[in-house]
Amino acid sequence: MNRRAPRKTAMLMAGVLVFLFLLQFILPAYHHSTFSKIMVLASYAVGFNILLGYTGLMSLGHAMFFSTGMYVTGICVYHFGFTGIPALGIGLVITVFVSMLIGAVALRTSGVSFLIVTLMFGQTAFLSVLYFDQFTLGQDGFTLTKELQPLVLGSTSFSYTDPNFKYNAAWLLFAVCLILSNLLILSPIGRVLIAIRENEERTQMLGYNTYLYKLFALTLSGTLSGLAGSVHALLFSYVGATFAEIHHSIAPLLWTLL
């Protein structure tokens, strides 16, 4: 492996993050929300790429993870009066559990079968959103504008509707996802995931339990996707069934391939 490659990747990543951070001081305030949404969805794509780009597994059910984080966080705020950070934490924990559970079942298959199983789970999640409309409010969804309280850090409070706060929160999410993804690929676990992508049978012959490594990759991928969904709910104060539809699983696939 080229020793300079990790350094070049780290420098490129740092350059992108610095550019995006400084961009907020150049852009007019009314563009901050647009770029905030781009960075949140880019974080979703980074999470998806751990499964597809690193491990070679194509999923059509990632909208399930994104919407799980979104709905759990949104329901905690809307129905139970939680503030933003605790609601996000609960959404993250539930997404980890769902990712592990779905992965434990879906990874018993491979290839096209895995694609179909993830699609099946994704559609089940979408139909569940419509069925349990007493909590999700069905197809229309719900807004968090009135229920969501400002984030209080010490003596300072931050409104989730403030464009500057949105931008910096989205930038922080993207930075965490990007750095974590880069650290993973440079780690021994990341090398095994790449080996599985290239030749799973040969990796098994070397003594690695590929099922557990793939389960780890799917769990981490789903968790980052759910985290992006939770942050999206808080920053844009809307939770809706459209984020659980299949097109929201296809979108990160296209972003990753492009």
Identify what each model region corresponds to:
Residues 1-258:
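Transmembrane alpha-helices and adjacent helix-loop boundaries
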